[in-house]
């Protein structure tokens, strides 16, 4: 029994990591296609049909490039930096429910690597470790411009993590759990949390742009300037890891938003599908529905990048500390008042 459980979870973990890598890889292709569409161009169309093999070509190019080490006494940290940035994005996917279950080989297979009752706390803990990957890489590069970019990125991520965490408190007050599986099950049908916590969703969405260093919060790396930010001194696959980590984080952020606020794998009529069509068909459709929601938010990230200009650094900090954090606190107070009123009414029999 234990060996079967270990095999089952190992397969689920491998599949989840593989899907995360593939989605992040093809997000680079989608980014270039969306940019081409908005700029009235064709985009990548040489490697494979419609440029579908372009991510593989980019990976081979990065892999074959020369390894460059700057004049730094911290070679080990120089290598560890991009590894931390990449691994944190992958580790977050372990607690996400990708579907309900599949009935295979006479047993139910849960479509989640692990269901822990502190999943949200785990996600915030892992995401906060990603700051170290950026800071270590910028500091170990022995380049003042890389260090400045790393300090900017770290201060931005830490600042917006506060507002993001506060926005989640209001949601947790309503759901009463940190388990992403339970939160998904509570949103069966169209009972989505975004209808009950629209302000939490808006704050979380804005903070997710800052957490992933996406435009208009990409002050750490200015692509149209000579200095590329904290990864200026990186080349080959180490550079690729930093770039790949951004797209992996974008995919994970889109998944978390879909699960927390838009029902995850749930869709209207899912229980009817289970009763009349079968568990496997209904839950496979649920997986497809989840990925449709994820792709929508990935497209939204890309659309914003090519339509909204970058903030100044003071505007970035003012938005985080003077607007989003106070709004999050007000949202907590409103949510608490509504819950208290509901409890009092229930106690009095109204």
From Swiss-Prot:
Return the EC number. 7.1.1.-
Q: What terms describe the molecular function in GO for this protein? A: NADH dehydrogenase activity; oxidoreductase activity, acting on NAD(P)H, quinone or similar compound as acceptor; quinone binding
- Signal peptide coordinates: none
Q: Which UniProt keywords apply?
A: Cell inner membrane, Cell membrane, Membrane, NAD, Quinone, Translocase, Transmembrane, Transmembrane helix, Ubiquinone
The answer to keyword Membrane applying to this record is: yes
Pfam families from the xrefs? Answer: NADHdh (PF00146)
Catalytic reactions of this protein: a quinone + NADH + 5 H(+)(in) = a quinol + NAD(+) + 4 H(+)(out)
Q: What class of enzyme is it?
A: translocase
TM regions (residue ranges): 5-25, 76-96, 118-138, 162-182, 190-210, 243-263, 284-304, 319-339
Compartments where located:
Cell inner membrane
Could you tell me the membrane topology recorded for this protein? Multi-pass membrane protein
GO process terms (BP): aerobic respiration
Q: Name one GO cellular component term.
A: plasma membrane
Q: What does this protein do?
A: NDH-1 shuttles electrons from NADH, via FMN and iron-sulfur (Fe-S) centers, to quinones in the respiratory chain. The immediate electron acceptor for the enzyme in this species is believed to be ubiquinone. Couples the redox reaction to proton translocation (for every two electrons transferred, four hydrogen ions are translocated across the cytoplasmic membrane), and thus conserves the redox energy in a proton gradient. This subunit may bind ubiquinone.
Q: Which family does it belong to?
A: Belongs to the complex I subunit 1 family.
Summarize subunit and interaction data from the UniProt record for this chain.
NDH-1 is composed of 14 different subunits. Subunits NuoA, H, J, K, L, M, N constitute the membrane sector of the complex.
Q: What is this protein called?
A: NADH-quinone oxidoreductase subunit H
The organism encoding this protein is Flavobacterium johnsoniae (strain ATCC 17061 / DSM 2064 / JCM 8514 / BCRC 14874 / CCUG 350202 / NBRC 14942 / NCIMB 11054 / UW101)
Organism ancestry: Bacteria, Pseudomonadati, Bacteroidota, Flavobacteriia, Flavobacteriales
């Amino acid at each position: 029994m234990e060996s079967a459980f270990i095999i089952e979870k190992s397969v689920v973990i491998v599949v989840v990591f593989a899907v995360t890598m593939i989605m992040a890889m093809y997000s680079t292709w989608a980014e270039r296609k969306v940019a081409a569409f908005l700029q009235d161009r064709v985009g990548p169309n040489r490697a494979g049909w419609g440029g579908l093999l372009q991510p593989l070509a980019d990976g081979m190019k990065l892999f074959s490039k020369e390894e460059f080490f700057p004049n730094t006494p911290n070679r080990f940290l120089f290598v560890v930096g991009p590894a931390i940035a990449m691994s944190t994005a992958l580790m977050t996917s372990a607690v996400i429910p990708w579907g309900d279950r599949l009935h295979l080989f006479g047993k139910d297979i849960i479509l989640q690597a692990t269901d822990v009752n502190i999943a949200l706390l785990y996600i915030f803990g892992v995401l906060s470790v990603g700051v170290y990957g950026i800071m270590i890489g910028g500091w170990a590069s022995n380049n003042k411009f890389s260090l400045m970019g790393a300090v900017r990125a770290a201060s931005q991520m830490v600042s917006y993590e506060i507002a993001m965490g506060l926005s989640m408190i209001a949601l947790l007050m309503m759901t009463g759990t940190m388990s992403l599986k339970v939160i998904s099950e509570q949103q069966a049908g169209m009972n989505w949390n975004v209808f009950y916590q629209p302000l939490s969703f808006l704050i979380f969405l804005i903070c997710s742009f800052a957490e992933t260093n996406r435009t208009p919060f990409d002050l750490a790396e200015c692509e149209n300037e000579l200095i590329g930010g904290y990864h200026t001194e990186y080349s080959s696959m180490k550079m690729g890891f930093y770039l790949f980590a951004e797209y992996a984080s974008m995919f994970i952020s889109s998944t978390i938003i879909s699960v927390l606020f838009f029902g995850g794998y749930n869709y209207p009529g899912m229980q009817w599908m289970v009763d009349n069509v079968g568990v496997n068909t209904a839950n496979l459709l649920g997986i497809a529905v989840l990925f449709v929601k994820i792709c929508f938010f990935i497209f939204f990230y890309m659309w914003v990048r090519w339509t909204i200009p970058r903030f100044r650094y003071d505007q970035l900090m003012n938005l985080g500390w003077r607007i989003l954090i106070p709004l999050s606190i007000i949202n907590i107070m409103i949510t608490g008042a509504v819950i208290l009123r509901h409890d009092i009414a229930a106690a009095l029999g109204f």
